[in-house]
Amino acid sequence: MALATYSDLKTSIANWLNRSDLTTEIANDFIVLTEADFNSKLRVRKMITSTSITIDSETESLPTDFLQVRDFFITSGGTKYALKYITPAQMDQIRGSSTTGMPSAYTILGDNFRFAPIPDSAYTGTLNYYAKFAALSDTNTSNYILASHPAIYLYGSLYHAANFLGGVDPQRLQQWQGMYTTALERLERNDREDQYGNAPLQQRGDVTVSGAFNDISRIITSNNN
């Protein structure tokens, strides 16, 4: 059957398992676990989104669907200034500094961004980031994965169902896991080809960062003296 909607997917999973008594588990466990899997593993163009963040304090909340930063910059006076990621440990080294100004670095602590220097006024930040795919539900009946790569949902859910049920033929379990992995890899490969065509990928050399980024190194060094 065609897997066009959330309802189609749940019906298909039940048919493949030959079980009509797993309605709750299919919706709340198998599909949800599959979504957690691919949101964790995939970083493809369809996941990239952008949002504007007002940076006027040392910490600002992450977007609710946030997975990973792609790039982050502040626009001030018509100029874009890239924000550099530093580790929480590096941020702790400069914590307590009286330095304020336009932030030039950030880290992530829990569900928050943390900036240094501490902003001395309100700045407009632009965050381009990888976002979770919208979860399927009775009100959100489809998304990019189901519409374009339904095998990810189907075989991922079957794999998680097999682990839940136990007693599934090992060969079938291995087959479902293999099909699930293949579907994920196919999506990643298609995404790379759409971006780069058949051109070979080249390893990037060291990137020299100038300007505000050097300020953080200086702040960390001065705080260690």
What is each of the regions a protein language model found here?
Residues 1-225:
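Glycine-enriched, solvent-exposed interface loops adjoining structured elements
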